[in-house]
Amino acid sequence: MAYNKDNFRVKTAEDAKEIGKSFLEEIDLVRVVDFGLPEVDDRYLVWRVPLKSKSGERIGELVIDAITTLIDRNKTTDKVVLENRLLGRIEKKKRKNNRSEGVKISTLRNTIGLGDSEELLRELPSQSVDLVFTSPPYYNAKPEYAEYFSYNDYLIKMQKIIHECHRVLNEGRFMVLNVSPVLIRRASRSEASKRIAVPFDFHRLFIEEGFEFVDDIIWVKPEGAGWATGRGRRFSVDRNPCQYKPVPVTEYVLVYRKKSDRLIDWLIRKHPNQQLVKDSKIQDGYEVTNIWKICPAHSKDHPAIFPLELAEKVIQYYSFKNDVVLDPFGGIGTTARAAVKNERRFASFELEKKYVDMMKKNILKEAAGKELNINYINM
């Protein structure tokens, strides 16, 4: 059934704020939480109302059905989460006066986990990881495959993962995401294919979960790499205006930092092992622009892997030797391999056992007999 804004019972931002005020009164947070600017989401027929601390930092979101005026409790930030984030802001203010506090060194062992990454992440201690690098699973790249009921369900799951990654990351450290728009192929000849701008939705999730945007790196593949998707072939034959579709040969590598009142150079100046800092210095031949030309990787064992070279660059540029590098969607272990190769520790999680078995094999091969002292979860 199609709706337009005439059907909305929540018509204005003020209407949304009034409903939000009732919600905050109900959960007894009306005196400590403010509203950001409410926005209507035409795709899902809801109002999204940012929830902020009194200092202006975003701590969550209220989602209101624009037609029924009901609050979507499943998609609205939970009271416990709001309270924890408010307490976190207060603790952060207290730390501002302690400028001599040094960089924390994680004691986490190398870890391989089998299972849902959201659940596995909960087993990691807070502030036990120094870098997160991952490529999230594609959203329903094939019409016959539907792991998620909707794109919104997919984003909700990804936000939960990002939330846990924020918790386990050390202060001021980085989370780097390899992601690209997704083409949903048409289910029949009478339907059009659809391209979803996934990276831009992920950006919103990162900001909501307490990260700050640092850089957008463009991974450029050789010109012929994108033809496998079939995109652009029809135009190359007919050349009709309005049918132009460029062949995608790029992906995003988005860089975010866990918010901190400390500057980035604090990570270097206050590191307790200055020899490790020197040993981690990036060598000549590094990337000087945000355009990285790297050939894609292919594997008969996994349909979607990124190249080892990409993982190595990210690890070298955003971590020190002996740091812990986390990949919550570990696949066959590319990130973990790159970590071992570059003298870092790793934590790598994967849902499917066949990939975990390959991951373990690939990591041990990369280690070439070096003792890794791996902690296995659910294995």
Predicted feature residues:
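Short, non-transmembrane alpha-helical segments in secretory-pathway proteins
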Residues: M1-P38
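Long, contiguous binding/interaction regions
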Residues: A2-N7, E57-I59, I71, T76
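Exposed beta-strand-loop-beta-strand "reactive/processing" segments of non-cytosolic proteins
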Residues: I27-I67
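Short, charged, solvent-exposed linker or helix-capping segments at domain edges/interfaces
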Residues: E61, R73-T77, L263-K270
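A short, surface-exposed interaction/processing loop segment used at functional sites
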Residues: A66-I90
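DnaQ-like (DEDDh/DEDDy) 3′-5′ exonuclease domain used for proofreading
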Residues: N84-K104
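Core catalytic lobe of class I
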Residues: N97-M358
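Short, conserved SAM-binding/catalytic segment
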Residues: E101-T107, K360-I377
